[in-house]
């Protein structure tokens, strides 16, 4: 009996011991060896565009590192082109290519090389074309995904090329019109000439 009582008492004390260990403070101290400059963190809100924000954030940090000053690159421009390209691939492969909000760093590099890039000021601020203060793709994603899938999985022998104009209009309503030319810091650019001026490769 005494043996059982001692074991029970010991078991009751175990949570107290583990609790005391949990309260131990971590004494690890980190020393900053080199702190790289970064641009402010932006809010993607209700959109699956973390890839666009992180990719352009990295490129903005690279510009700072290269001594090119602070730039605020436009996620809307990148996302617009990426989604249009992805829709084209999904339709050409009859839906065998994923058409979703996600993306990767490669999409940013591809956009930079093929379409250029623009500063944030060259397009409306995220969400403003539809009365929000930030991106909200809940409705956009549902509509565009259904539209692209309907065309991609269609049994039509020939796809009417008007689909691109329709999809382009949907994106224009959410992102604003893609600029052909814009003025930035007193100089006129196209998206391609602006990208070239940044010196990213």
Regions found by a protein language model. Name each.
Residues 1-23:
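Bacterial Sec-dependent N-terminal signal peptides
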Residues 22-201:
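Catalytic-core signature of thiol
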């Amino acid at each position: 009996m005494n043996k059982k009582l001692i074991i029970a008492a010991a078991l009751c004390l175990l949570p107290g011991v583990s609790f005391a260990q949990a309260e131990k403070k971590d004494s690890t101290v980190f020393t900053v060896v080199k702190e790289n400059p970064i641009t402010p963190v932006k809010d993607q809100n209700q959109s699956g565009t973390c890839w666009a924000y992180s990719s352009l954030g990295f490129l903005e940090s690279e510009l700072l590192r290269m001594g090119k000053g602070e730039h605020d690159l436009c996620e809307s421009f990148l996302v617009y082109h990426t989604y249009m390209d992805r829709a084209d691939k999904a339709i050409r492969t009859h839906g065998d290519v994923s058409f979703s909000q996600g993306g990767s760093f490669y999409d940013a590099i591809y956009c930079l090389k093929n379409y250029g890039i623009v500063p944030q000021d060259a397009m409306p601020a995220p969400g403003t074309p539809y009365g929000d203060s930030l991106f909200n793709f809940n409705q956009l994603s549902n509509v565009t995904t259904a539209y692209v899938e309907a065309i991609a999985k269609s049994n039509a022998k020939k796809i009417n090329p008007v689909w691109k104009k329709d999809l382009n209009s949907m994106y224009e309503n959410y992102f604003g019109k893609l600029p052909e030319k814009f003025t930035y810091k007193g100089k006129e650019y196209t998206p391609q000439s602006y990208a070239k001026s940044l010196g990213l490769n």
